[in-house]
Amino acid sequence: MARTMTMRVSSLLVAVVLLAALSFQACSGHGGINDGDGQVDAPATPASSSGVRSKGLIAVKVWCLVILLVFTFAGGVSPYFYRWNESFLLLGTQFAAGVFLGTALMHFLADSTSTFKGLTTNQYPFSFMLTCVGFLLTMLSDLVIAAVARRSAAAGVSDNQVSEQQQRQQAEGAVMSRKEEEAAAVAHPAMLVRTSSFEDAVLLIVALCFHSVFEGIAIGVSASKSEAWRNLWTIGLHKIFAAVAMGIALLRMIPKRPFLMTVVYSLAFAVSSPVGVGIGIAIDATSQGRAADWTYAISMGLATGVFIYVAINHLIAKGYRPHHPTAADKPLFKFLAVLLGVAVMAVVMIWD
C-alpha cells in the first residue's frame, strides 16, 4: 500500500513539474501579431522569411516533434503500469479544453486575421471562413468514423444472426455430440467480443490520429521559436491527457490487456502529431515571401476550427468519464477547470 502511494505521489510530481516547465517555456517569449495596427510582424519581408526557416527554428520544431512523440507514447502506455487518479484526469481534460479554446480564439484566429489584413485590402473575413471550414471538416471526419463504426457493428450482429441460424439448421439435420455443441456455443461469442473490441480500438485510434495530424501542422508552420514552444505547450497538454485516457480505454476494450497491442496503439497515436509537425515544416520550408504568409494565414485559420471542435465536442462535451463515482465529477468543477485553462492562455497572451 505504501509503495502504491509513493508511486502515485511521484507520478503526480512528475506531471506537475512537466506542466510547470512547459508553462514557463510558453511565457518566456512569444511571436505573433503586433499592437493591432494591421501590419504583420517578421514574416512580411523576404529577409525575415528566410529567418523563419532558419536552422534554429527548424531545430526547435524537431525538438517539439521529439517531445510530443516521447511524452505522448509514455502517457499511452502508462495505464498498463499505473492506475491514474480519475479526478485528476477528469479535471485535467477540462483544463486542456480551456487551453485549446483560448489558444484557438486568442492566438490562432488573431494571427490569421492579422496576417490576412497585411496581405490583402479585401474586407472579406477570410480567417473566420477558414475557421468554419476547419470546424466542418473535423465534424465530417467524425461523422464518417461514426458511420463506419455503426456499419461494422451492424455487420457483426448480422453475421452473428446468420451463424445462429446455421447452427439451428445443422442441429435439426444431425445430432452433434455434447462436447461439440459446448465448443460451438463458447467459441463464437468470444470471437465476437474480440472482433468488436479490435474494431472499436482501431476506430478510436483513427479518430484521434486524424485530429492530431492537423494539430501538429500548427507547430510545423510556426513563425518563430517562441510560437513553436507555445504551440507545443498547448498541444502537448492535450495530447498527454488524451493519451492517458486512450490507454485506459484500450485496456478496457482489450480483455486480456496485451502489452504489445497497447504499445502499438500508443505508438500510432504518438506518431500522428509529429507527422503533422513534419508536414508543417515541409509546407513552411517550400513557401517563400508572400506565399509563406498566405500559407501561414490559411493554416492558422483551419487550425482554429479544428481546435474549437476538439475543445467543445471532444474535451468539454465528452471528455474523460470516470468509471467510479468521484467528487470532482460535477458541472461546477468542470466549468472552473475550463475557466482556468482559458485564464492561463489569457495571461500568456499578455506577452504575445
UniProtKB/Swiss-Prot annotation:
GO cellular component: membrane; plasma membrane
Residues on Cytoplasmic side: 78-87, 149-200, 252-262, 318-330
Annotated protein name in UniProt: Zinc transporter 1
Biological process according to GO: zinc ion transmembrane transport; zinc ion transport
Tissue expression notes: Expressed in vascular bundles of roots and leaves.
Stated family: Belongs to the ZIP transporter (TC 2.A.5) family.
Main localization (coarse): membrane
Species whose genome carries this gene: Oryza sativa subsp. japonica
One annotated GO molecular function: zinc ion transmembrane transporter activity
Entry membrane topology: Multi-pass membrane protein
Protein's job: Zinc transporter that may mediate zinc uptake from the rhizosphere. May also transport other divalent cations.
Coiled coil: none
